[in-house]
């Protein structure tokens, strides 16, 4: 079994082992904005409780993040290594918990100063939002992302150098499109390599 396949065989529910595999691949260039990490903490509290939020923050040594500061992506993974075992139990399984977390994080982002800027930029049009997904993600974290259209309202969104499982991004993408009143939104993600994934996105 390849190293990547072994990594995928470990569930996010398993905490340190799963996230530790990803932490071992982090470089100094892998960063996240404070606004993203603060939204993750809020989602941990919303999906779990205040005690879990505090334990997760303690795991990375940061009680609060400043919106436009850059932080090592490792802090994000450290938080999740603590939070995910409990969240997976509360929300059926790890994929459900991660989907809900991604949804919460996206909704919180859209209410931020950066998110409001994105909403002005895309003028309420789902297709404009999708075209600007690489830019939107860069406001929150590093990594390479691209969009390839396969039809008028369907595309393939590709991520490279991304440390989160597909279910997290599925929740984020659904939330952002539904917020723009897109109907029958469908997002199906697949892991294509250890730090790479792709998403088939469609709506009506």
What residue spans do the PLM features occupy?
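N-terminal low-complexity or simple alpha-helical regulatory segments
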Residues: 8-110
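Short terminal or interdomain "cap/linker" segment that borders an active site or interface and mediates
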Residues: 25-26, 30-34, 137-170, 177-204
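Amphipathic interaction/junction segments at domain boundaries or subunit interfaces
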Residues: 65-168, 189
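Extreme N-terminal basic, low-complexity initiation segments
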Residues: 2-6
